[in-house]
UniProtKB/Swiss-Prot annotation:
EC class: ligase
Similarity field: Belongs to the tRNA(Ile)-lysidine synthase family.
Molecular function (Gene Ontology), one example: tRNA(Ile)-lysidine synthase activity
Catalyzed chemical reaction(s): cytidine(34) in tRNA(Ile2) + L-lysine + ATP = lysidine(34) in tRNA(Ile2) + AMP + diphosphate + H(+)
Subcellular localization(s) per the UniProt record: Cytoplasm
Any GO BP annotation: tRNA modification
Protein name (Swiss-Prot/TrEMBL): tRNA(Ile)-lysidine synthase
Originating organism: Streptococcus pneumoniae (strain 70585)
Length: 425
């Protein structure tokens, strides 16, 4: 194939339509060097500013010489290049994580929004086959994605539809360690696939076909389940066990960096079925929150170091506190103003719940803990609920319940009103 053929493919796919700056992960191998040649030649046509990034893994004698040559190449092309050296105990996983962390740093520094890698169809076959041998979940057998949004960046793999044999032989560095079978991927490439191709010469095409078919099913299920609120457990549990599992897996696709194992997935299923309330970290900075018939998975948000102190409000005063405006005896106007009868004889205390808190209702004392359970108040709402206290007794739990003391206060000569308005925090 000729270079213009690759350009036409890139333009047809619109890989760089949304991007002004792109970082190319440049290893020095044939695939990344040819991608460099295409992108640097057609920067104007693709309307991108190209930035190069290279990781020297320090695993071969030639590594430092290759780094120098790449610096020369960047200088000749008048392109910026960023280089980082891997250190520590080497493994495929550590090296991969190091590379992507470094690439993200470069993107943040340069304002680039696209990371371009030279993965091709042969890499795709190896990846799918590796995952199959490892016993990964079905959805991961769709392989590497052509385009993948991770946070605020997009990873683009424009060579994924091409095989390595489609690339012309140009100047590049040959990694001799690729011929050794020390690493799993090398054994796949050098031994397993060639043997299986003796049985089926089109084995690579078959693997790619399976990956594409799984991707089709995955996308179809996502589209068909678009109107199903999986986080509503009543809705989720109305389906068969098999459908529940598929819907839950589709829901988990929203969190590409979560990657639950089969055992962890089964544990999440069990929690959703058995626990009424649950909040706990699960993996990779995510937590599972369940509150009766609702659940969600979200990033763990940082907690404040210290709780806010109790607030004291005096008669004829106003104060904004935790998203509300409290006005003691001074009327507020509006349709959504809450009014609680109180006494003007003493100040009002506004706080969060404490151990042993009691509310009087219909002449009976009820512990807040029991009240919250009876009313099925979610744990998060229990912890954030504002309690209004006067004369050492709870007058109201804002938006949840009111003490019968307020009825007595209505007819008291010293009565007044606490006005409450929801405001932006």
């Amino acid at each position: 194939m000729r270079e213009p053929d690759f350009l036409n493919h890139f333009l047809k796919k619109g890989y760089f339509k949304k991007h002004a700056k792109a970082v190319l992960a440049l290893s020095g191998g044939l695939d990344s060097m040819f991608l460099f040649k295409v992108l640097s030649t057609y920067q104007k046509e693709l309307e991108i500013e190209l930035i190069l990034a290279h990781v020297n893994h320090k695993q071969r004698i030639e590594s430092d010489w290759e780094e120098k040559e790449l610096r020369k190449l960047a200088a000749e092309a008048e392109l910026p290049i960023y280089i980082s050296n891997f250190s520590g105990e080497f493994s495929e996983a550590r090296a991969r994580n190091f590379r992507y962390d470094f690439f993200q740093e470069v993107m943040k520094k340069t304002g680039a929004t696209a990371l371009v890698t030279a993965h091709h169809a042969d890499d795709q076959v190896e990846t799918i086959f590796m995952r199959l041998i490892r016993g990964t979940r079905l959805r991961y057998l769709s392989g590497i994605k052509e385009k993948q949004v991770v946070g605020e960046i997009e990873i683009i793999r424009p060579f994924l539809h091409f095989q390595k044999k489609d690339f012309p032989s140009i100047f590049h560095f040959e990694d001799t360690s690729n011929q050794e079978n020390h690493y799993f991927r090398n054994r796949i490439r050098n031994s397993y696939l060639p043997e299986l191709e003796k049985e089926n010469p089109r084995f690579r095409d078959a693997i790619l076909g399976i990956g594409n078919e799984i991707l089709d099913y995955d996308l179809a299920i996502a589209e068909l389940s678009n109107n199903i609120n999986v986080e509503d457990l009543q809705q989720l549990f109305s389906y068969s066990e098999s459908t529940q599992r598929v819907l839950l897996q589709t829901y988990l696709n929203r969190f590409p960096d979560l990657n639950l194992t089969k055992a962890q997935f089964a544990e999440v299923q069990q929690i959703l079925k058995s626990k009424s309330q649950y909040r706990h970290p699960i993996k990779n900075g995510y937590e599972l929150i369940k509150e009766y018939q609702q659940f969600q998975i979200c990033k763990i948000s940082p907690q404040a170091d210290e709780e806010e102190d109790e607030l004291v409000l005096h008669y004829q005063n106003q104060v904004a506190y935790q998203g509300y405006l409290f006005s003691f005896g001074l009327p507020l106007e509006g349709e959504s103003i809450q009014q609680i009868p109180v006494s003007r004889e003493t100040s009002i205390h506004i706080r969060h719940r404490k151990t042993g808190d009691v509310l009087i209702q219909n002449g009976h004392r009820k512990k807040l803990r029991r009240l919250f359970i009876d009313l099925k108040i979610p744990m998060e709402k229990r912890n954030s609920a504002l309690i209004i206290e006067q004369f050492g007794e709870i007058v109201s739990i804002l938006g949840i319940a009111t003490n019968n003391l307020s009825k007595k206060t209505k007819n008291d000569i010293m009565n007044t009103v606490l006005y409450i308005e929801k405001i932006d925090r």
